[in-house]
Amino acid sequence: MNKPVLDIQDRPTVGQWITLSLQHLFAMFGATILVPYLVGLDPSIALLTSGLGTLAFLLITKWQVPAYLGSSFAYIAPIIAAKTAGGPGAAMIGSFLAGLVYGVVALIIKKAGYRWVMKLLPPVVVGPVIIVIGLGLAGTAVGMAMNGPDGKYSLLHFSVALVTLAATIVCSVLARGMLSLIPVLVGIVVGYLYALAVGLVDLSKVAAAKWFEWPDFLIPFADYPVRVTWEIVMLMVPVAIVTLSEHIGHQLVLSKVVGRDLIQKPGLHRSILGDGTATMISALLGGPPKTTYGENIGVLAITRVYSVYVLAGAAVIAIAFGFVGKITALISSIPTPVMGGVSILLFGIIASSGLRMLIDSRVDFGQTRNLVIASVILVIGIGGAVLKISDSFQITGMALSAIVGVLLNLILPGRPQAAENLFEENQSDHVA
């Protein structure tokens, strides 16, 4: 490992602080605003809560884990379903419960260790569920890319999506250095400029917006009644269980980048609690659930600047951006096909990352056990199976596939042993 330019506890100069913090802001910006755009939440609150959530995460992890938290893609479909079932308030209640699950898991890990998590959620379960999450959103991405405001096919709109997609792909594959970490942002900018040129952008709201504007917060009890239903629980909680594996994966990669076992110190329980707390803070203000971002881990790896103060600086800037009305209006003016073009690649990458998890973990599909578990998860999840227990309680698609996968893994014989030490195992194996 190369010597860090700034280690975890090193303070940068003022000039370094601003420049390096902006790099992290740009790395997370595109994905963080895309999620609220897709689910109908306020992008300014997503930015603000990403900053607040990151600061809470850094505090809970004793300023020892250099990570940035942005909007989680895993919750897109559940949030849309929850909003359909009970409005935005129901989605926020579900998000808060998801964060609460993280808190409970963190407490159990502190008392009993983390091996039980690996037994419950091995790659043969998590990989196919991640594939389901990505492919389950494929129709949404294509619809956004192809259709006009009237819901009918539009070649003009599709051309905007294709230009956006092409720019994102070129940046992802050919760009080097910092530019390679912001393909989503580059794609959105290029697509936006093309949409502006062909007349699909209305800048009147940007011109009319104030520079300082209070975000449209969504506060429990004040803006919506707090009512927990089984339907909301079963929409959101299974996703939280699955995204635990994503969190652990990010901590392993981050440990490898900074050359320290973050699983042991400050401890996996602290990082999970930090992630859950960030999600709960976001839910209380009307933002989407949070997760640590691989893009920002990439920034750490390229710059070799691991300072938590740089991440905190990015968080403060994100909070400030949440109150800039012009930025919110500019985000809102992005045409749907621009986001559709980006989403085609992003949702495909989510699905492919599930496949990559299976490959990296060397899951043997020559074993009937693994083949059965993965096959059932994929068909139930992508097929949209629904277990309707009553008129007010049903378990749908992705959540049902995750639950079935966990149960099959526990019931079927031949379950492999979980690793004793995740960090040591992944020092010799390739993890990304």
From Swiss-Prot:
UniProt topology in membrane: Multi-pass membrane protein
GO molecular function, one term: xanthine transmembrane transporter activity
Keywords, in A-Z order: Cell membrane, Membrane, Transmembrane, Transmembrane helix, Transport
Predominant subcellular localization, coarse grouping: membrane
GO CC annotations, alphabetized: plasma membrane
Pfam families given in the database record: Xan_ur_permease
Compartments, as annotated in UniProt: Cell membrane
TM stretches of this protein: 25-45, 65-85, 89-109, 124-144, 155-175, 181-201, 206-226, 228-248, 305-325, 330-350, 370-390, 393-413
Family: Belongs to the nucleobase:cation symporter-2 (NCS2) (TC 2.A.40) family.
Function comment: Transport of uracil in the cell.
Name of the protein in its database record: Uracil permease
Native organism taxonomy: Bacteria, Bacillati, Bacillota, Bacilli, Bacillales
Gene designation: pyrP
